[in-house]
């Protein structure tokens, strides 16, 4: 006696088309410390992060570029396992003595929150700024990082990371 195997339906619900572009434009990342670097936020009191939505410790950082081709550049912060996809903020990855109810958020040089989410039509996240490469082939991509309370924070360590790619227009 043979059992009949279920047949797969041949009809698809839809098609997803992926589009992209590879360019010959390039820059050299010349940030002190190289392409991988740390941003050290100040130690803040839990009282400054006592309510959901409170922010503290805004700290500037820059990605410095040299030897760029003419045009415009921006930073694409890669969504990944360190990102809260609901908020676009960075999750606290501290494993021991971790502060709770604290995430990190990025802001552009215009002080607008920069959620780390998938790219939109402009190929940079909302509020990310395109910077025109200078005549000397350099560009500075300026940002801020700050603590963000999701509820009353508890004391402890906060650490996270995000991968980034320089994008060209």
Curated annotation (Swiss-Prot):
The smf-1 gene is present in clinically derived strains, including strains isolated from hospital environment, but not in strains of environmental origin. It is found in: Fimbrium. InterPro entries: Adhesion_dom_fimbrial_sf, Adhesion_dom_sf, Bact_Fimbrial_Adh_Pro, FimA-like. Induction: Expression is temperature-dependent. Expression is maximal between 30-37 degrees Celsius. Not expressed at 18 degrees Celsius. The keyword Signal applies. One of its GO terms (cellular component) is pilus. Transmembrane segments: none annotated. Its main location: other. This is Major fimbrial subunit SMF-1. Involved in adherence to eukaryotic epithelial cells and abiotic surfaces. Mediates agglutination of animal red blood cells. It comes from the Bacteria. Belongs to the fimbrial protein family. The gene is smf-1. It comes from Stenotrophomonas maltophilia (strain K279a). It holds the Pfam family FimA. Keywords: Cell adhesion, Fimbrium, Signal, Virulence. One of its GO terms (biological process) is cell adhesion involved in single-species biofilm formation. The keyword Signal applies. Residues 1-11 form the signal peptide.
